[in-house]
Amino acid sequence: MSKRDYYEVLGVEKSASERDIKKAYKRLAMKYHPDRTQGDKAMEEKFKEVQEAYEILTDSQKRAAYDQYGHAGVDPNRGHGGGHGAGDFGDIFGDVFGDIFGGGRGGGRQSRAARGSDLRYNLELSLEEAVRGKSVEIRVPTLAECDTCDGSGAKKGSSAKTCTTCHGQGQVQMRQGFFAVQQACPTCGGKGKIITDPCDVCHGQGRVEKTKTLSVKVPAGVDTGDRIRLSNEGEAGENGAPAGDLYVQVHVKQHKIFERDGNNLYCEVPLSFTRAAIGGEIEVPTLEGKVKLKVTPETQTGKMFRLRNKGVKSVRSGSVGDLICKVVIETPVNLNSRQKELLQELEESMGKGKETAKNRPKESGFFDGVKKFFDDLTN
């Protein structure tokens, strides 16, 4: 089945900024996250699709390759082996032009092929953990350097020998008509060396399957979509080549009270209609504890109150966002007879018809508009 366009997956234009891409990813990651979809396999696949699109489009090199070559430009099978990393932009040129124009590309491609694959680890955090930062231990299945042969692939006491076919170059030259074509050496597979006495543990690969335990320091202020790079903590390279990197992908779980947008936090504050009418102080939650909020008299539902510097401290700039409280006026329920009497008295005290305009201007204006509408229909 053909892959969907990454921009289409995230619902953004091809010209979208990194900020737009991040906002789209955050929205879709929350929508399709397995915690919310309760084992729905189709939703799980959509979640993976969204993650893949985000990973490519927020990496400038991978995005450039994708924009020019489509999915072929970021195909992991064209890069340095394994299913964890993304494809290498340079490999496209190496495959197409390297054999024709000689060893410049070929030498580079040899080292890329031997480097360990990059890995990705999905880390879930609560909002509090993301805002405050923390150190976490993670366990990552990977290919690690073989301790028995120290990553060489050769049995202790022996070493790899220089390939006699390519004389250690990893490439051989063949003529095709007028062209001298460089190709990977068929004898050593492009490595330049041959292991004649391989290690009994790793069978000449220089690496073995292992689960590593790593400590990750999560900086305060991270958000869904942020990535933490751990250099050289990916898969070990073949036969002592450099290791890949580990990317820890952050996902912040949905909070019961707060919603986050950038460095600002939002919450809905239920308010009795009497308190909304006469005003006063109420307590509202923040991530540091409760604070007092002064409600102005005659507050209407939907009104926003901003508490400065009660949001999230930016992981990049250090500036602190705000907490925005949205008032939701609550209609009382389960009233006893006395409470109903008092409310009825209040209702009657406000008068009828035009007399209500003073205390309930919106209601009065609405019914005046309705009356005018029907008057116009009959005239």
Curated annotation (Swiss-Prot):
Belongs to the DnaJ family. Residues 5-70 form the J domain. GO terms for molecular function: ATP binding; heat shock protein binding; unfolded protein binding; zinc ion binding. Disulfide bonds: none annotated. HAMAP family: DnaJ. GO terms for biological process: chaperone cofactor-dependent protein refolding; DNA replication; protein refolding; response to heat. Pfam families: DnaJ (PF00226), DnaJ_C (PF01556), DnaJ_CXXCXGXG (PF00684). Participates actively in the response to hyperosmotic and heat shock by preventing the aggregation of stress-denatured proteins and by disaggregating proteins, also in an autonomous, DnaK-independent fashion. Unfolded proteins bind initially to DnaJ; upon interaction with the DnaJ-bound protein, DnaK hydrolyzes its bound ATP, resulting in the formation of a stable complex. GrpE releases ADP from DnaK; ATP binding to DnaK triggers the release of the substrate protein, thus completing the reaction cycle. InterPro entries: DnaJ (IPR012724), DnaJ_C (IPR002939), DnaJ_domain (IPR001623), DnaJ_domain_CS (IPR018253), HSP40/DnaJ_pept-bd (IPR008971), HSP_DnaJ_Cys-rich_dom (IPR001305), HSP_DnaJ_Cys-rich_dom_sf (IPR036410), J_dom_sf (IPR036869). SMART domains: DnaJ. It comes from the Bacteria. It is found in: Cytoplasm. The J domain is necessary and sufficient to stimulate DnaK ATPase activity. Zinc center 1 plays an important role in the autonomous, DnaK-independent chaperone activity of DnaJ. Zinc center 2 is essential for interaction with DnaK and for DnaJ activity. Binds 2 Zn(2+) ions per monomer. Its main location: cytoplasm. It comes from Pseudoalteromonas atlantica (strain T6c / ATCC BAA-1087). Its cofactor is Zn(2+). Zn(2+) 1 binds at C146, C149, C199, C202. A zinc finger (CR-type) spans 133-211. Homodimer. GO terms for cellular component: cytoplasm. Keywords: Chaperone, Cytoplasm, DNA replication, Metal-binding, Repeat, Stress response, Zinc, Zinc-finger. The gene is dnaJ. This is Chaperone protein DnaJ. Zn(2+) 2 binds at C163, C166, C185, C188.
